[in-house]
Structures are given as structure tokens and as C-alpha cells.
Amino acid sequence: MLDLAFVRANLELVEARLRARGQNPAELLGDFAAVDQHRRERITEAEQLKATRNKLSEEVARLRKAKEDASAVMEETRQLKTKIEDLERAATEAEEQLRERMARIPNLPYEDVPTGASAEDNVEVKRWGTPREFDFAPKPHWELGEQLGILDFERAAKLSGARFAVYWAEGARLERALAAFMLDLHTREHGYTEVLPPLMVNSRSLFGTGQLPKFAEDLFRCEDGEPYQAGKYRENDHWLIPTAEVPLTNLFRDETLDDSQLSTSLVAHTSCFRSEAGSYGKDVRGIIRQHQFQKVELVKFTRPEDSAAEHEALTRHAETVLERLGLPYRRMLLCTGDMGFSSAKTYDLEVWLPGQQVYREISSCSNFDAFQARRAGIRYRPRGQGKSAHVHTLNGSGLAIGRTWLAILENYQQADGSVRIPEALIPYMGTEVIESRNVAQGAK
């Protein structure tokens, strides 16, 4: 959430940055200035009447002490009390209107974020690794996985419907090996603290990280007998997490951290659940876009002056996973029109997929500035200062396990259909190659 005082003092700048995002400021802000002015005027009037009431109360006391009639002054005091209550109620209603507007306004992009309308305007920052030259036509991961008997879409559809997968044998082991490898790397070398959070969170948590109220349709809500009405939710509703960013960030919700606790770096391996409401017809083959998937998530809480450097560090931590696995990738700086709702600056890491001849996103690393901290009430007390301030929050995938899994299949496939295991994963896999096991080829 943006700072109300900042928006009030910099309304033209806010409108310009929203336009750079491809947003309509008039639609988002509405009559923000008028409502804010109305609220401030009602507060001022109420304060003035309170001062008058206090003087009248003193007059009542004086009259009573002098044993004089104070009824007229007391009646005036009662009338003032009613007027003050009406003014305060009007100010509260205006503040609620402002909060509702502010909750739906996205973060403002940093000045060094390129202006653009879509992914076509993102800027490539770097490339690592040279895509392998094959002496045969490389296959996409869905063909490789089914031929090896380690990926089963037919049975997954029988169990759960579209956009689910069953992993068999070495396929399941490769997912587990990737998670263990990533967690070990981030905790042992990058200084993250591992957390195992709940997979269900309340509405307040999703508001804190920015998924609610605007993106409820992208989430899975857990039914509790109460009929759900689109666009309406309750504070105690439970939702399946779309990413571990949500529980990790909200661990410190409504808390004030000590300066010595920053920067704090957390990592979690969890299942993630997304409805993919707006992706009908996209990536219908393979495991690029699933309702349920595994991810290792990185989250940082930093001082404002450290967040830019910590953003670069977090992105490098995600890149290190790809480099250790020998997977070619590129880093993209997202333009204003392609950024997430809560982000002030985002790098996407895109891995090369030879079976599809394309780079695909495998990690998104974002600096949220104080946007999430303001929504979630996460503050810290700077050393030597009495007044607290909002922390900056950052997060990134370190990495999406399913997409790393498919990238290994496509980049390490052999002419005979087998798949070599990257050297860094051999200790976790206990084998150097995945060959066809026909595990999933039973009766159908």
C-alpha cells in the first residue's frame, strides 16, 4: 500500500507513475483529493469543536462552583458532543473510502524501471551459459517424461482434472533432490533460515502481500460451509497459498523488529496452489502452468537503504542455482507494464528450453519497497532513533522446482531418450542417468 501522506503531497507524480504502469489514474484514484480534503476538514472541525467544548466544560464547572445556573451551557455542550460525533463519523467513513482505494492501487515503479506496455518491452540485463547444440531434434519435456515413464498426465487428470501431474520413480526423486539441493545451497552458503510454514493462510495474510482484494479469482479458497460470493471474503477465511511469499512475509505482520534483526533472510520449500483463472488456452501441454506445484521461495526483510543491494544479492542467489545445475539463462528487467501489483522493481530469470526453443520464466525476484510492509504493518526501530519505520520486503523463487525439473529434462536429454543428471544433483539422486523404467505403464 502506498503512503497516504506521500500520495497527498505528490498526486501528479503518483498519477504519472500509474500511467507508466498502463493504469488509469482517474479510475484508481477517483475523487481521492476531494475525499481526502473532506476527511481533513471534518477532522479539523471536530478538533475545533472539542476545544470549544473543553472551554464550555470549564464554564460549567465555574458556574456550578458559584452555585449559578449551568443548564444552558450544559445543553450547548451536549449539542457540541453530537456534532463532534457526526464529524468524527464522517471522517472515519472518508478514511475507509481512502483505504479501500489505496488497497487497489499498485506499487509505483522505481525510476530505473524501463517504461513499457508488455513483456515485449522488458530489457535483457545479462545471459549466462551457451545453449547446447544437439545432433538430434530435442524433445519437449512432456514427451520425454511420458516416454521415460516418470510423468503421468492421464492418471493425474483422472484424479484431479486438467493442469495436474503425477511424478513416478526417478521423476518424483528428481523433484525431491532439487528441493534438497536448493535448500542446502540457500541455507549453507547464502545465509537463509529455513522455515516450514502452513499451506493455508487467512485473508489478512493475503491482503498483506497484495493478493487480496484484487486477485481473489487467482486463488483457491477453502470452503467451510459458508457460500462464497465472488469479490467478497471474510477476515477468517482460509486460502491455499499461491506462493510461500505469503506466509513468510506475514510471519512478522503487525510486529516491530529490532534494527539488529535486519536484514533477515528466510527460505521455504512448499507446495503452491493457483487457479490460473486468466490462463485458459495457455501452456496446456506439460507442467509449465499447473494448479499445484513445488517451489523454493526466498524472502528478505531489510532496512530501506539496503534493499537495492539486497535485491541484487537475492537475484544472484537464484541465479546460482541455475549456474550450479548448468542451465543457460538470461536475466530480464521487467518494464512498468509487466510488473506485479506489489513490485517496485522486478528481475525475471528465464531458463533456456531446447525442446521448445524458447526462454521461459523460472524465477521472479522483486523489491517491494515498503508497499507490503505498510499493508502488513511490519516495522523496525532504527538504531539510535525512537521512531519506528517500515521495513522493505523482497522475495524471489529460488527456484520453481517443476520448471527446473523440466529444464533438466530438456537440456540434459540424450539421443536414446535417457536424461543425464547434472553433477551437482548426483549426490541427491544417487544415480547419474534417468532411463526408461516403464513404471507408469501399467494397466489403463
UniProtKB/Swiss-Prot annotation:
Keyword Coiled coil included in the entry's annotation: no
GO terms (BP aspect): selenocysteine biosynthetic process; seryl-tRNA aminoacylation
Domain of life: Bacteria
Subcellular localization(s) per the UniProt record: Cytoplasm
Family: Belongs to the class-II aminoacyl-tRNA synthetase family. Type-1 seryl-tRNA synthetase subfamily.
PANTHER family membership: SERINE--TRNA LIGASE (PTHR43697:SF1), SERYL-TRNA SYNTHETASE (PTHR43697)
Domain notes: Consists of two distinct domains, a catalytic core and a N-terminal extension that is involved in tRNA binding.
Name listed for the protein in its UniProt record: Serine--tRNA ligase
Organism, scientific name: Acidobacterium capsulatum (strain ATCC 51196 / DSM 11244 / BCRC 80197 / JCM 7670 / NBRC 15755 / NCIMB 13165 / 161)
Upper lineage: Bacteria, Pseudomonadati, Acidobacteriota, Terriglobia, Terriglobales
GN (gene name): serS
